[in-house]
Every structure is written in C-alpha cells, then in structure tokens.
Amino acid sequence: MGNVSVAVGTAVGIPIAVGVIIALIFWCKLQRRYKKEEIRDADLEKMVMEEVAVSVYDGFKAEINSSSEASTINEKEANQDLKPCQEKTAKAGYTPAYRRQLNASMGTLRPKKQSTAYTNVPVIFSGEKVNYGMVRDPSYSFMYPLTLSRKETSSLRSASTSNLSSSTENTALHEEIKLDDPYENDFTNYTVNKREFIDSLRPH
C-alpha cells in the first residue's frame, strides 16, 4: 500500500508541480514584459507631451510674431501717412535764409509813410523875420522850409492873363505860401527851386 500511495502521489504531484513551475515562469515573463511596456509607454507619453509643448510654444511664438509684424506694419503705414502732412507743414512754415534776408532788405529800402500831423508846429517868434522861406522850430535849432500850396488852374490862368504890378503878385504869392512837410528840409536847394519856379510863372 505504501508503495502504491507513493507512486500515485508522485504520478500526480510531479506533473502538478511542473505545471505550477511553468506557470510561475510564464507569469514572471509577463510581469517583466508589462514593466517594459509601461516604461516604453511612459517614454512615449513623455515624448508626446514634449512635442505638444513645443508645438504649442511654436504656435504662440508665431502668433506673437505675426501680431508684432502687424503692429510694425501699421506703424509704418501711419508714419507714411503722416510724412506728407509733415512735409507740407514744413514746406509751408519754412522760409529760406536768403528769402528772409531779401525781405529784410526790402523792408529797409521801402520808404516809411510820413505822418501829415506835426508833432511840433513851427512858429515865427516875435521880431524874427522869414529868412528865405525858412521858419524856426521852437524845440529844435534847424529851420523848416516854406513852400507854395498847389494852385488851381483857374488861378494860374487868371494870374497869367492879368497885368498886375509886382507888389500885388508878391502879396498874393506870400498869402498862398503854407507850411510843407517838415521832412523836406533835407533838400537844401528846395526854396531856391521854388523861387525860380515862381519867377518863371511871372509874365515878362
């Protein structure tokens, strides 16, 4: 009996033990394979995440570059639009140096308008006579010239046709003498020319 039980136990136990051992071997191999696959999957996932991050960064960078390029283009267009206006204002407001000098020289050469109102009315002091058609200014030492006022053509014609005496003509001429512009005293021969003109009007 003992031998039979040993034989049955060995006949049954040995195959079972072998099967268990084989199963353990396959299980260990599968576990190693699973670990390798997990490591590989982790590496693949890491690579995918890196690629996604790089692509997202590249897209964001491209968007920033496009926006900056658009802003620079808009600024350039705005500057180009403003340049003609600035050039027009500069051309309108700028005056060359030779033009300014020419305007200044023309201003100096242009005669000033003489005022018809006298600041100091020339008078004749008592006891002082008219000296060759000159009258003294009370505030200054120089003399103002006296000149004839414009005659009417009718008075000239009547004076030329009438045969009055020299004393009557002199009286009429002295009554028509009035004070002329004080700035004409620069012409020293003004009175002489006036007297020659008066003498030429007298009938011979």
UniProtKB/Swiss-Prot annotation:
Q: Where in the cell is it found?
A: Vacuole membrane
Tell me yes or no: is Transmembrane helix among this UniProt entry's keywords: yes
Q: Which residues form a coiled coil?
A: none
GO CC annotation: cytoplasm; fungal-type vacuole; nucleus; vacuolar membrane
Instruction: Name the source's superkingdom.
Output: Eukaryota
Segments crossing the lipid bilayer:
6-26
What the record says about disrupting the gene is:
Increases frequency of mitochondrial genome loss.
Q: Which UniProt keywords apply?
A: Cell cycle, Membrane, Transmembrane, Transmembrane helix, Vacuole
Please report any disulfide bonds recorded for this protein chain, giving both cysteine positions. Answer: none
In the bilayer, the protein is annotated as: Single-pass membrane protein
Instruction: Give the function comment from the record.
Output: Involved in cell cycle progression and surviving DNA damage.
The UniProt similarity line reads:
Belongs to the SKG1 family.
Q: What is this protein called?
A: Altered inheritance of mitochondria protein 20
